[in-house]
Amino acid sequence: MSIFEYNGSAVVAMVGKNCFAIASDRRLGVQLQTVATDFQRVFKIHDKLYIGLSGLATDAQTLYQRLVFRHKLYQLREERDMKPQTFASLVSALLYEKRFGPYFCQPVIAGLGEDNEPFICTMDCIGAKELAKDFVVSGTASESLYGACESMYKPNMEPEELFETISQALQSSVDRDCLSGWGGFVLLVTPTEVKECVIKGRMD
């Protein structure tokens, strides 16, 4: 078993019209044994920027703490929040710096940039970025997430439709992966508000 599959995970981000949504499952397991059913994988950097960390849970939490530290230093120095593109470069550099003993994480970054333009990207454990204009996925359920997102995604979705689409894609995907699931957590971010929602799924 790959170390990336040890805890199980499913993270997906999707772009709409001047908005984005990022979602994850809530299961923390040790291989096939379930340890927690309310585990957080999506973290806030600031009001318009979020990161989802799939992979090894301990590394995800350590990496998040280092990223918060770096972002707070940036805020003190620049007196403004980081743009999503800048933050993606920071995460990439941080991961590549540790390439010989990497954090076993695959980050998904989603944010609203200038003119409320949505930005999403993902990367591997050594910081190789993959930018997208529609959706990005990571985690043990990534294969089924790709299929679900490709069949359900439409460009320029309104926030309500985007929320429904990403929720359905996550739910149908984790049902096909025994290492992730136990409901989901969805964040919908528009220029004026942030909507958080816990969705119920199959609890097995």
Curated annotation (Swiss-Prot):
Keywords: Cytoplasm, Nucleus, Proteasome
Predominant subcellular localization, coarse grouping: cytoplasm
Pfam families according to UniProt: Proteasome (PF00227)
GO biological process annotation, one example: proteasome-mediated ubiquitin-dependent protein catabolic process
Bilayer-crossing regions: none
GO cellular component: cytosol; nucleus; proteasome core complex, beta-subunit complex
SUPFAM superfamilies, alphabetized: N-terminal nucleophile aminohydrolases (Ntn hydrolases)
Compartments in which it is found: Cytoplasm; Nucleus
PANTHER family registered for this protein in UniProt: METALLOPROTEASE TLDD, PROTEASOME SUBUNIT BETA TYPE-3
Function description: Non-catalytic component of the proteasome, a multicatalytic proteinase complex which is characterized by its ability to cleave peptides with Arg, Phe, Tyr, Leu, and Glu adjacent to the leaving group at neutral or slightly basic pH. The proteasome has an ATP-dependent proteolytic activity.
Protein family per UniProt: Belongs to the peptidase T1B family.
Description of how the protein assembles with itself and partners: The 26S proteasome consists of a 20S proteasome core and two 19S regulatory subunits. The 20S proteasome core is composed of 28 subunits that are arranged in four stacked rings, resulting in a barrel-shaped structure. The two end rings are each formed by seven alpha subunits, and the two central rings are each formed by seven beta subunits. The catalytic chamber with the active sites is on the inside of the barrel.
Protein name: Proteasome subunit beta type-3
Native source organism of the sequence: Oryza sativa subsp. japonica
The encoding gene: PBC1
